[in-house]
Amino acid sequence: MEFQRVTEIRSRDGHMVPAYLWVPAGTRAAVAVVHGYGGCKEQMLGLAARIAERGLAACAMDLRGHGEHPAPLGPGLLWDLEATIVWLRRFGRVGAAGHSLGGRLALMSSADVVAALSPALTDRPSEEGRTMLVRVGGTSVRSPAPDTILDILRALPPTPVVDRPTLLVHGAGDIPPLIRGLRDFAAALPRAEVRQITRSQHQPGAFPPGILGYLHAWLNHIDLKANDEVYVEAPGWLAGQLLEAPTGKVDRAGP
């Protein structure tokens, strides 16, 4: 299977859409894999790899304001996904798989089939949702202002009802209004399947009073593996040690 970085995808306004691509031998179809708000293409590589193992070319891409995309967060998010879908048509039919905001964009796209994972179907999140988007979700986003995402969500057109195979996925412990919105939307679609994920769900429970003061440190710890600075520092160090430094075996057996 071939794996490569893609640099030739161009959005409607001329910006490059950075992407990684898996290409199985003899593939006749492809899937654009799109992250949610605050994510990046690297976070979607696991899903893309599993899709590629099923014989489909899989392209994980960065939306503007995220990852290596050169443009700041703005209203052209769907342009980035559409440019990726158009580019992938060289392989044949094209699907779109997206999470959260990426799932909403996938449902708005021209893809032949769509898998939307916990899609953000509401344009007006709850107070709790707004707080998470502004205070937590946008840490890695290059945005004109912390609340730009709220303006973008409000400006999105209604999610279209399209007659195509559509998979809608939510977690059993997902956000309740999101689950209701997903199931209501599924009822309006001609060819929709709904899947509920039950494994590896966080369970509700009481928290100690000091948890909010600890939360930012925990989130920084969890997010480090997907930090763009880590993507530069760790690979560079490893390559320097293994490919450029003098070779030498380390005796791990001990005396």
Which residue stretches match the model-derived regions?
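Alpha/beta-hydrolase active-site loop
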Residues: 43, 72-89
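The alpha/beta-hydrolase serine catalytic core
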Residues: 95, 104, 108-254
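Alpha/beta-hydrolase active-site loop signature
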Residues: 38, 62-67, 121, 201-202
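The serine-hydrolase catalytic nucleophile loop
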Residues: 37-49, 180
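Short beta-strand element of the alpha/beta-hydrolase
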Residues: 28-36
